[in-house]
Swiss-Prot record:
Keywords: Microtubule
Domain of life: Eukaryota
UniProt KW Aminoacyl-tRNA synthetase keyword: no
Stretch list, region Disordered: 1-100
InterPro entries assigned: SPR1/2/3/4/5
Keyword Ion transport: no
GO cellular component: cortical microtubule, transverse to long axis
GO biological processes: cortical microtubule organization
PANTHER family in UniProt: PROTEIN SPIRAL1-LIKE 4, SPR1
Function as written in the Swiss-Prot or TrEMBL entry: Acts in maintaining the cortical microtubules organization essential for anisotropic cell growth.
Biased composition (Polar residues): 76-98
Family to which the UniProt record says this protein belongs: Belongs to the SPIRAL1 family.
Official protein name in the record: Protein SPIRAL1-like 4
């Protein structure tokens, strides 16, 4: 009886969901015509550098990387954004503690009995 080794299939077909997102093996055709030599430092002819932009056919092929998030922007606790979307909960359990949402706050920020009181609904004269 053979023992399964790490990285080997135990048979039975595909066990991952890759078949939903990857093309069939017979559909994959290697394209070796677009390979280029990466070791040279020569600039291709016809390239014009304008500031940070390159004007040529190869400029269309370059991929622009997204700017990485600043540490402040990626962490809402130290972010300069308003703190209206950070709530502290006092419940005991797995979902207790700091709750961060992107919704605006609906918390009433007035003193009890103050201008946000619903006394006018119940006949209070002061409201």
């Amino acid at each position: 009886m053979s023992r399964a080794c790490r990285g080997e299939s135990s048979g039975g077909g595909r066990s991952s969901l890759g078949y939903l997102f990857e093309p069939e093996p017979e559909d994959i055709i290697p394209d070796h015509s677009t390979k280029s030599v990466q070791g040279t430092n020569k600039a291709p002819k016809g390239n014009i550098v304008l500031g940070d932009k390159m004007a040529s056919d190869e400029a269309d092929q370059e991929h622009q990387a997204a700017a990485p998030l600043k540490k402040e922007d990626s962490n809402p606790i130290v972010s300069s954004r308003s703190a209206s979307n950070i709530y502290h909960t006092n419940q005991v359990g797995n979902n207790s503690g700091l709750l961060i949402t992107d919704r605006p706050s609906t918390r009433v920020r007035c003193a009890p009995g103050g201008p946000s009181s619903l006394g006018f609904l119940f006949g209070d004269e002061d409201a």
